[in-house]
Amino acid sequence: MTETIKTDVLIVGAGPCGLFAVFELGLLDIKTHLVDILDKVGGQCAELYPEKPIYDIPGVPMITGHGLTEALMEQIKPFNPTIHLNEMIESVEKIGDPEFRVTTNAGTVFECKVLVVAAGGGSFQPKRPPVPGVEAYEGKSVHYAVRKMEEFRGKDIVIVGGGDSALDWTLNLNPICKSMTLVHRRDDFRGAPHSVEQMRQLVASGKLDLKIGQITELQGEDGQLSGATIKLNGNSIAQIKCDAMLPFFGLTMKLGPVANWGLQLENNLIPVDTGTFETNVPGIFAIGDINTYPGKLKLILSGFHEGALMAQKAVKYVYPDKRVVFQYTTSSTNLQKKLGVN
């Protein structure tokens, strides 16, 4: 029989918002476990743009998704959270007021007083390009995210798409690849104007081959690409050499089992009280991109703010008889002791 894990708070999602929630809850002596469907912490930052620069974290002019994840992991070390990776929450059962029994697809069972949903936008899956047989190359020479730039050094790369991701990786990978082709169905790009301008400069200097059209066929064997056929606008055909393809057709968001937890939903998002970030179910909170409220901004810094306010309400469920006095880490010797800096 599976042993039940008892914890004060269970956090669903180990992205930046979920990790920072551990910090805010830890300051209040609240023990946490985290569950994430991915095989690593960091959420979208680690999975989709680990080496992409982030410029809007307060006080940090630039940091990568990987760097931010590492910094947050270092920040929460004093609170020693337990993290369960490669697991997805399958069921949530209310067994107290409030108390929940939560079961994962791996059979892990938790009992917690508070449940925090920090699952980003749910489960993100990249959209496949409409090219016959592309799945045979996925994971080996067709990649939907860049996890290590060095893997593309010296390669003949084809990037497909016209949005920010396609343009960003065109600019970032161009200096290290052997050759690069950018394919988009029209000569009109949705990315940031500055990125479009830089891309066109690469084309003008001969460092980037821009093809306006669509890939219709891939060549290769045993999962390794060797070339691609492009039907250009005007119906002429171009053949290119490539050993790596990066399609950026956007992501499909799937809310997954969260939709079956009895939470009020609004366009696949969870409405919350903006003073506490509690959902319509007492004891269940939602922070980060998964929630919605008037004026919502899908920014990491917004999720940090939401986590801080959530913790102030969560502590009342965990310690209902305890008088909690708000303290500052700059002046509280109690908090500094918890952080190991005093």
From Swiss-Prot:
Q: How is the cofactor bound, as the UniProt entry phrases it? A: Binds 1 FAD per subunit.
What's the domain of life for this entry?
A: Bacteria
Which reactions are catalysed by this chain? 2 reduced [2Fe-2S]-[ferredoxin] + NADP(+) + H(+) = 2 oxidized [2Fe-2S]-[ferredoxin] + NADPH
Which residues are in coiled coils?
none
Q: What is its EC number?
A: 1.18.1.2
Question: Which metal ions or organic cofactors does this protein require, according to UniProt?
Answer: FAD
Could you tell me which InterPro entries the record lists for this protein? FAD/NAD-bd_sf, FAD/NAD-binding_dom, Fd--NADP_Rdtase_type_2, Ferredoxin-NADP_redctase_2
Residues that bind FAD? 17, 36, 44, 49, 89, 124, 289, 330
Q: Name one Pfam family in it.
A: Pyr_redox_2
Q: Which GO terms describe its molecular function?
A: ferredoxin-NADP+ reductase activity; flavin adenine dinucleotide binding; NADP binding
Q: Which UniProt keywords apply?
A: FAD, Flavoprotein, NADP, Oxidoreductase
Q: What does the subunit comment say?
A: Homodimer.
Which family is annotated? Belongs to the ferredoxin--NADP reductase type 2 family.
Question: Which protein, by its recorded name, is this?
Answer: Ferredoxin--NADP reductase
Taxon lineage: Bacteria, Pseudomonadati, Pseudomonadota, Alphaproteobacteria, Hyphomicrobiales
